[in-house]
Amino acid sequence: MEEGARHRNNTEKKHPGGGESDASPEAGSGGGGVALKKEIGLVSACGIIVGNIIGSGIFVSPKGVLENAGSVGLALIVWIVTGFITVVGALCYAELGVTIPKSGGDYSYVKDIFGGLAGFLRLWIAVLVIYPTNQAVIALTFSNYVLQPLFPTCFPPESGLRLLAAICLLLLTWVNCSSVRWATRVQDIFTAGKLLALALIIIMGIVQICKGEYFWLEPKNAFENFQEPDIGLVALAFLQGSFAYGGWNFLNYVTEELVDPYKNLPRAIFISIPLVTFVYVFANVAYVTAMSPQELLASNAVAVTFGEKLLGVMAWIMPISVALSTFGGVNGSLFTSSRLFFAGAREGHLPSVLAMIHVKRCTPIPALLFTCISTLLMLVTSDMYTLINYVGFINYLFYGVTVAGQIVLRWKKPDIPRPIKINLLFPIIYLLFWAFLLVFSLWSEPVVCGIGLAIMLTGVPVYFLGVYWQHKPKCFSDFIELLTLVSQKMCVVVYPEVERGSGTEEANEDMEEQQQPMYQPTPTKDKDVAGQPQP
């Protein structure tokens, strides 16, 4: 391994003159060095999970499960079962998160267990499609609910929607670049806001039940089918329910910034996912106290229709709640996706500048700018919804691959420290459930799934050219070094130190012995920037 890559984890960065780096003491997590801060406590950790799971779906279109389940009772069962399966998957990720205590989530786990190519493909599909498209869609939903009251008789102009979505992305990127604490406070506030809005829906549902409005909750009516029962549609209902819980694994992307991750990672999971399951189930119960299944399926914004029926002049609360929920969702996604790209760059799978952090704010500014720019590019395309359909299958495929990796790790390395060790029955249950859903997805939409696989496999030549090929032309290396140096000076960023004795340090050293990074700076660049006077 060349010295340049080793320098990434060098914790003794000095000035050219031989003195220590002048990064402020508060910047690092220890010893005055520049490092990611451990600022995410239990409350903020719960906010990240809840805020990323609960987006606009439960307010706007929870009807996907009901439409395919065929009855209210079966739909509620689907919500409960998918919540339970999500808890099982989260328990598997909790064990992996404390066994491999690195940011990057399933990307880091897949890479460490199955090798660089498998990890790169997970990162490739996330960088290329998943995060940019999802963030663009959430931002567009936010702008739609903000602008719709200004255009009561028509749809808001498309250009206005995209402009406001871009402003939302730029504002939240600035917040995340400025301070981890600001970003987590924004997440906490907007998560609390969406939970209060859902609590209002649930309370109104309880009031409706007390008034005797529970026709569709009586067993004889709850299981009355409004369409012919079909096992394929029931499977699709489970798939829709699983999509609604998407984001449950996002806390694993920021493991290194958690305060006491060995305790707070599992605690946040145990608190957040049962809470989300409770909210999802009882919000749907509340909806059917005010609307029949047919009315619910006909509504384009279920919570808004619910509010119009029960809130009267206060019905405006619901669209505002959707807007607040999506705003918080964009913030949470920017926060976690930037850490994924940061982790990928640190492993040598993305340009190395993305693995740098600001010398005083200790935020991964290059990674945040990267995810923001890629999302803005998606905003100007017209095919992002199609792309989401294509790669949704791949995203959930990697959930199964990651959990399978837990079993492989138990077999290959049975003696490594595991602060949390769950029964192997849990990953087996999870894998059986996901095998059923993935096989059904392949059977029902083979073309869509095939295109998704093809998009993922475009990463194979990129991996061999960018990562595996070690002896690149000197002109290419010189250009990348120049680009890295310019980016460092523009963003005032350096490589972070790695805390001694952490699992991250050992994992990075193992990585360096096994593979060459995609882009590799020389050691002097970091020192040059560290020696610059800071603004």
Swiss-Prot record:
TM regions (residue ranges): 45-65, 74-95, 117-149, 158-178, 182-210, 231-252, 266-287, 313-338, 365-382, 387-408, 424-446, 447-466
Membrane topology field: Multi-pass membrane protein
Gene Ontology cellular-component terms listed: apical plasma membrane; basal plasma membrane; basolateral plasma membrane; microvillus membrane; plasma membrane
Binding-site residues for L-tryptophan, renumbered to this chain: N134, N395
Keyword Protein transport: no
Ranges of compositional bias, category Basic and acidic residues: 1-17
Expressing tissues: Strongest expression is observed in kidney and moderate expression in placenta and brain, followed by liver, prostate, testis, ovary, lymph node, thymus, spleen, skeletal muscle and heart. Also expressed in fetal liver as well as in the retinal pigment epithelial cell line ARPE-19 and the intestinal epithelial cell line Caco-2.
Example of a GO MF term: antiporter activity
Biased composition (Polar residues): 514-523
Segments for region (Disordered): 1-30, 502-535
Activity regulation information from UniProt: Inhibited by the L-type inhibitor 2-Aminobicyclo-(2,2,1)-heptane-2-carboxylic acid (BCH).
Residue intervals on the Cytoplasmic side: 1-44, 96-116, 179-181, 253-265, 339-364, 409-423, 467-535
Any one GO biological process: valine transport
Modified residues (Phosphoserine): S29
Binding annotation for L-leucine: I53, G246
Membrane topology, Extracellular segments: 66-73, 150-157, 211-230, 288-312, 383-386
Catalytic activity: L-histidine(in) + L-phenylalanine(out) = L-histidine(out) + L-phenylalanine(in); L-tryptophan(in) + L-phenylalanine(out) = L-tryptophan(out) + L-phenylalanine(in); L-isoleucine(in) + L-phenylalanine(out) = L-isoleucine(out) + L-phenylalanine(in); L-valine(in) + L-phenylalanine(out) = L-valine(out) + L-phenylalanine(in)
Top-level lineage group: Eukaryota
Major place of residence: membrane
Assembly: Disulfide-linked heterodimer composed of the catalytic light chain subunit SLC7A8 and the heavy chain subunit SLC3A2. SLC3A2 acts as chaperones for correct plasma membrane trafficking and stabilization of SLC7A8 and modulates the substrate affinity and specificity of SLC7A8. ICAM-1 associates with the heterodimer SLC3A2/SLC7A8; this interaction regulates SLC7A8 activity.
Family matches, as NCBIfam families: 2A0308 (TIGR00911)
Family: Belongs to the amino acid-polyamine-organocation (APC) superfamily. L-type amino acid transporter (LAT) (TC 2.A.3.8) family.
Primary role: Associates with SLC3A2 to form a functional heterodimeric complex that translocates small and large neutral amino acids with broad specificity and a stoichiometry of 1:1. Functions as amino acid antiporter mediating the influx of extracellular essential amino acids mainly in exchange with the efflux of highly concentrated intracellular amino acids. Has relatively symmetrical selectivities but strongly asymmetrical substrate affinities at both the intracellular and extracellular sides of the transporter.
Protein name: Large neutral amino acids transporter small subunit 2
Organism listed in the record: Homo sapiens (Human)
